A protein has these predicted regions:
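Core subunits and conserved enzymes of cellular information-processing
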Residues: 2-215
Length: 215
């Protein structure tokens, strides 16, 4: 059962180590493809207008209590998460850089070309699609083993520390983050809740599918 997956699978296009700036073409291709799906999913959540992602809610909540913008706080949160990588033994790679670039581009493209659904039911459907897309995309790029974005690296590090399933670790992390953000005054929508509870299982599903297809 994919919900019990504890480790990032290794396939024939996985990099031997995260710190690899000369990966095989197939490794780089799947890394970028996964990140494109990830960014598309993030963009679809924004377009759905059903609520922000948990980490955005945290940044919003913090902005209501300190004299800093949501953008600056989002950056500071990412830096803080990266600092937590150190005791967890996580190492950056080319995907750590590509994560920021590709996801940002895909979000902008999605916002520009994907219209917001005209009724709430379709907005909810789009939110479900967005969470699934983020999870599967995340699973694909993590299997490439070229490093991870701040939140995904934290998830992997905490999984190794606790030995809990990836779905459990990611779900607990996202639910904790959105809870703190909501407590601080951040706005929570149904899309936020779907993301917080659904992203863990969806990442695990992505890992499971890649493992089944390539092993």
């Amino acid at each position: 059962m994919f919900l019990k997956i504890k480790n990032i699978p290794k396939v024939n296009w996985s990099s031997e180590k995260p710190y690899n700036f000369k990966p095989k073409f197939s490794t780089l291709f799947f890394c970028c493809f996964g990140l494109m799906l990830f960014g598309l999913g993030e963009g679809l959540l924004i377009v759905s207008f059903t609520g922000a992602s948990p980490w955005s809610v945290l940044a919003q909540g913090l902005s209501l209590n300190v004299n800093l913008s949501i953008g600056i706080l989002t950056f500071l949160i990412s830096v803080t998460v990266l600092i937590f990588w150190i005791p967890l033994g996580q190492k950056p790679g080319i995907a750590t850089i590509l994560n920021a670039l590709i996801i940002a581009i895909m979000i902008d493209l999605c916002i520009k070309f994907v219209p917001t659904p005209s009724n709430y039911i379709n907005q909810l459907i789009l939110a479900v699609i967005s969470v699934t897309t983020v999870g599967i995309g995340g699973g694909i790029y993590l299997v490439a083993n070229l490093g991870a974005g701040p939140r995904d690296g934290l998830m992997v590090g905490l999984q190794k520390l606790t030995n809990f399933p990836i779905a459990t670790v990611r779900g607990t992390l996202e639910i904790s983050v959105v809870s703190v953000g909501w407590y601080l005054g951040g706005t929570v929508g149904i899309g936020t809740i779907l993301f917080a509870f659904g992203i863990g299982p969806c990442v695990a599903l992505g890992l499971f599918l890649v493992n089944r297809l390539f092993n």
